């Protein structure tokens, strides 16, 4: 992978000039000047997904110049490097191969001279056998009862991905009740333990090293709770499984290492739902549906790695994002799924994007002088319309939005879905085209009112429009289409990281806080006043000690 400062390319300079020409052009003008705009600025994927990027402040010239930027930063070479197993995560000397986990073609993928696919398939087969025993009731707890509840204990990538997918695929779930515990706040696990029975509960402890502070604190609390009823430590083996690579620590915890499911250092946490970390997904929706999830992602992997850049959906979305972030000064992107099952999708890609591309040091080790990763946020529609859409429509900040919706709902109650989708379509139209003063005044006339008498209200009812959006319309949310959608966003993030010359697959920014927390923890063990930090931290710790007493 080449290390190229994007701002030093001729394409970046051309884009800066182009921005000066485009900054006052409106989306309404772009549509008025081109009756075929939708056809030119939209594309389908496998007849399962339509991506409409026509309601953006872009022209064919804009996209051509952005594609030039991708060429000058050698995006094509970087894609080949990732898929071929090159160690593109250079700060940790690791390959980046979540694509191998869903490589349904079984084409060899080589890391350090070794094909990883046999090991990937072996773990998949092991998960299949284990999950079938749990789901069928063949696996019994220590009193001979079948498992009814599964508690996944993890944090970050070991929690966000499985939680998001199991929620998104709820229509496919079986009889097992799924619970997720992540926060080290004891309230989280305490509330989950109130809902489950130790005789019929399986705990999945998801920690690659089996040393993650939050996860192991929760795991030990779960173990203590379990043993209060079960008594004999040998029963732990029937109620705990590990998603880890540390066999020694897993065995010491009391888990049978036969029920330890491995993954590899080339699997990043926030890209790990496709690995053994996805065992909770399998237990929720069954192995066949998990394979469909993998297959959907693999189909998008093929699209990303083989489709020309001009028609490549992850690349197009990535380039449009860079256009707004670096030239228009937009600092955030909203992800707005119009599907209640997808209520954790924005939170998942908040981590996916911000932990990947929230970096200020480039691949040469130098501080950047341009924008890198955006702030990602969002909530399901239509809830967001009654919360923060006011700012998106009439605020002073540009917030590019991705609207996501299925054409077919899993719950066709009366006309609920038509009403939901009418809002989905209306919002992007309103954001793009707005409402002029003239239209507001005419509406008053149509109501028999004199606009002159309402002059004090008219300005507040004007919508400037020109707010950019992408619309992603799925035929239906299935395991396959969800897998493709997740992979679409993963590759968008990777593309932006390549072009912006940052390392997308490390996360050193999470380390300092953990180091300081480990230093502070022993200081909280007594009631002595603390003076070893800055005055603010000392003051906070000392007030905490005074109040807890």
From Swiss-Prot:
Keyword hit for Isomerase: yes
Family: Belongs to the GPI family.
Catalytic reaction(s) noted: alpha-D-glucose 6-phosphate = beta-D-fructose 6-phosphate
Keywords (A to Z) from UniProt: Cytoplasm, Gluconeogenesis, Glycolysis, Isomerase
Domain of life: Bacteria
Subcellular location: Cytoplasm
UniProt xrefs under InterPro entries: G6P_Isomerase, G6P_Isomerase_C, Phosphoglucose_isomerase_CS, SIS_dom_sf, SIS_PGI_1, SIS_PGI_2
Active site: 355, 386, 514
GO cellular component: cytosol
Name the record gives this protein: Glucose-6-phosphate isomerase
Biological processes annotated in GO: gluconeogenesis; glucose 6-phosphate metabolic process; glycolytic process
One annotated GO molecular function: monosaccharide binding
PROSITE patterns: P_GLUCOSE_ISOMERASE_1 (PS00765), P_GLUCOSE_ISOMERASE_2 (PS00174), P_GLUCOSE_ISOMERASE_3 (PS51463)
Family annotation (CDD domains): SIS_PGI_1 (cd05015), SIS_PGI_2 (cd05016)
EC number: 5.3.1.9
Summary of the function given for this chain in its UniProt record: Catalyzes the reversible isomerization of glucose-6-phosphate to fructose-6-phosphate.
Zinc keyword on record: no
Top-level taxonomy: Bacteria, Pseudomonadati, Pseudomonadota, Gammaproteobacteria, Enterobacterales
């Amino acid at each position: 992978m080449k290390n190229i400062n994007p701002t030093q390319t001729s394409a970046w300079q051309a884009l800066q000039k182009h921005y000066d020409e485009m900054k006052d052009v409106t989306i309404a003008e772009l549509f008025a000047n081109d009756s075929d705009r939708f056809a030119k600025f939209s594309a389908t994927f496998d007849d399962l997904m339509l991506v409409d990027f026509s309601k953006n402040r872009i022209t064919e010239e804009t996209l051509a110049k952005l594609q030039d930027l991708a060429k000058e930063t050698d995006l094509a070479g970087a894609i080949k490097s990732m898929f071929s197993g090159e160690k593109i995560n250079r700060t940790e000397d690791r390959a980046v191969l979540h694509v191998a986990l869903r490589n349904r073609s079984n084409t060899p993928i080589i890391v350090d001279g070794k094909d990883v696919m046999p090991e990937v398939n072996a773990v998949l087969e092991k998960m299949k056998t284990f999950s079938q025993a749990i789901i069928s009731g063949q696996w019994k707890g220590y009193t001979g009862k079948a498992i009814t509840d599964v508690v996944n204990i993890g944090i970050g990538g070991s929690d966000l991905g499985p939680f998001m997918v199991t929620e998104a695929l709820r229509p496919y779930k079986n009889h097992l009740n799924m619970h997720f515990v992540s926060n080290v706040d004891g309230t989280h696990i305490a509330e989950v333990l109130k809902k489950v029975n130790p005789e019929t509960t399986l705990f999945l402890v998801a920690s690659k090293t089996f040393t993650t502070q939050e996860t192991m604190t929760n795991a030990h609390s779960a173990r203590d709770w379990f043993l209060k009823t079960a008594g004999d430590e040998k029963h732990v083996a029937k109620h705990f499984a590990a998603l880890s690579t540390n066999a020694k620590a897993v065995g010491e915890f009391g888990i049978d290492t036969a029920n330890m499911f491995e993954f590899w250092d080339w699997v990043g946490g926030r890209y790990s739902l496709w690995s053994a970390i996805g065992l909770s997904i399998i237990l929720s929706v069954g192995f066949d549906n998990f394979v469909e999830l993998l297959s959907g992602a693999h189909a998008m992997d093929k699209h990303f790695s083989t489709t020309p850049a001009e028609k490549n959906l992850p690349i197009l979305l990535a380039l449009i994002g860079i256009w707004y972030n670096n030239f228009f000064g937009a600092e955030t992107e909203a992800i707005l799924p119009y599907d209640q099952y997808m209520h954790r999708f924005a939170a998942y890609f908040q981590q996916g994007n911000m932990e990947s591309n929230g970096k200020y040091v480039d691949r040469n080790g130098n501080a950047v002088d341009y924008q890198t990763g955006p702030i990602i946020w969002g909530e399901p529609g239509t809830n967001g319309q009654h919360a923060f859409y006011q700012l998106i429509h009439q605020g002073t900040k540009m917030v590019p939005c991705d609207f996501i919706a299925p054409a077919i709902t899993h719950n066709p109650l009366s006309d609920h879905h038509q009403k939901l989708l009418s809002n989905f379509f209306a919002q992007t139209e309103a954001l793009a085209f707005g409402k002029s003063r003239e239209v507001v005044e005419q509406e008053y006339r149509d109501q028999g009112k004199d606009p002159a008498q309402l002059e004090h209200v008219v300005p507040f009812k004007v919508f400037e429009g020109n707010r950019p959006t992408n619309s992603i319309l799925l035929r239906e949310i299935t395991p396959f289409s969800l897998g493709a959608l997740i992979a679409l966003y993963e590759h968008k993030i990777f593309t932006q990281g390549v072009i912006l010359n940052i390392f997308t697959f490390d996360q050193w920014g999470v380390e300092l806080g953990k180091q300081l927390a480990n230093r502070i923890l022993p200081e909280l063990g007594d009631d002595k006043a603390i003076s070893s930090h800055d005055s603010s931290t000392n003051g906070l710790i000392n007030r905490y000690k005074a109040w807890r007493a």
